[in-house]
Design a protein with these regions (language model features):
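Polar/charged low-complexity regulatory segments
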Residues: 1-139, 143-151, 155-197
């Protein structure tokens, strides 16, 4: 997914052209099916927006492509226009448990300077997300806890009583054998450090 370019996003460096090519190929060859879950559509949208962030369309090319068009379905770094954001209304009224689960699945979207409807939903429900983080830790669901922690670090505004930094340390200690957990925890730390500067 888009986390392939995460080091470039977090450190503000140009990605390796080979990494861009791999992500571009994934976007083009594996578009979501029309009946794909919302999380799949959002993941695909984020891969496209990440590619465009580092490899924008050629100068002078404009236009918009939607998810129903051929370009929208498989458009990457060389595409023209933009891929429309999928619907995120399903997040607004989701119970906090489901909300946290869905956001942890969408943790790759939790990056700085990448606004989206999912990010706005997360920012509007930081208390629910903090609750979900604690619940995931108590249930020993380290991947969900790491994903929720990454969102909290990306958007800020978590309750001070949460102790996110120590919570992330614990999540990494207990679940760090899973590379996805380690990735989310380290991304969260980098974003929290950048916010503190």
């Amino acid at each position: 997914g888009a986390d392939l370019l995460l080091p470039s996003v977090l450190y503000g460096r140009h990605p390796h052209p080979g990494d861009v090519a791999v992500l571009d190929r994934a976007v083009r060859e594996f578009p979501p099916k029309p009946d794909a879950p919302a999380a799949t559509a959002w993941s695909h949208w984020h891969m496209i927006s990440t590619l465009q962030r580092f490899a924008p369309p050629p100068p002078g090319v404009t236009g918009t492509t939607g998810p129903g068009t051929a370009a929208g379905a498989g458009a990457g770094a060389g595409m023209t226009g933009t891929y429309a954001e999928p619907d995120a209304a399903w997040l607004e009224n989701a119970p906090w448990q489901s909300f946290t689960h869905q956001l942890s699945v969408l943790a790759p979207l939790a990056v700085p300077a990448a606004p989206s409807a999912v990010q706005r939903a997360a920012a509007d429900r930081t208390v629910d997300l903090a609750r979900g983080f604690v619940r995931a830790v108590r249930r020993r669901d380290w991947l969900q806890a790491a994903g929720a922690g990454r969102w909290l670090a990306a958007i800020g505004g978590e309750p001070a009583t949460l102790g996110l930094e120590r919570g992330l340390d614990f999540v990494e200690l207990m679940g760090g054998h899973d590379p996805r957990v380690t990735l989310h925890v380290r991304a969260a730390r980098l974003m929290a450090e950048a916010r503190a500067r």
